[in-house]
Amino acid sequence: GVRVEVGPSGYDQPGAEALWRRAGEVGAVICAHLQRDYLGELAALLARFPQVPVVLDHCAYPRAADGLADEAVRQTVALARFEQLVAKLTFAVTSSEREYPFADTHAQLREILAAYGPERCIWGSDFPCEHWLKKSTYAQHLAVFAEELGLGVEEKAGVLGGTALRLFFGA
């Protein structure tokens, strides 16, 4: 995949248009790394390029303290209408204001999982997470999804690998 950051001119601008067009031609996955302020621009690109698979990195960084009312959560859930969009659930630790098991993000994770289904959600580790997130080890980050959320076998299979294998490797 190609990770796309937001530049000074916004997300939906001529350079992005060319990149998305080319991604559609070659079958590349766009990994959209952006804040909540750019979700409207992302929606416009998703509408124009339905053939381009897209991963929403960190789900636009919800704020754990805002719970299910958080605007990034609400908009991420609304964007589930775009079938080519996959939610990357890395915010489980990044957005948390607590220590392991980062329970203040669990309701948000479940809400997004319910909207997209495990076939359109992927786990991300923020590897090397010990470098970026001093409050979490790789094992703890993984355990949030493997143990703490109470996901079923099929949900775990999708979120912890199956969806990524299909998306990036056609498996």
Segments predicted by a language model, with ranges:
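Glycine-rich phosphate-binding "P-loop"
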Residues: 1-11
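Divalent metal-coordination and catalytic microenvironments
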Residues: 2, 23, 58, 87, ...
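Residue-level "edge-of-site" marker
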Residues: 7, 36, 126, 159
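Catalytic pocket-lining loop regions of alpha/beta-barrel enzymes
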Residues: 9-122, 131
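Mid-to-C-terminal alpha-helical segments outside catalytic/metal-binding sites
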Residues: 110-111, 115-122, 131-171
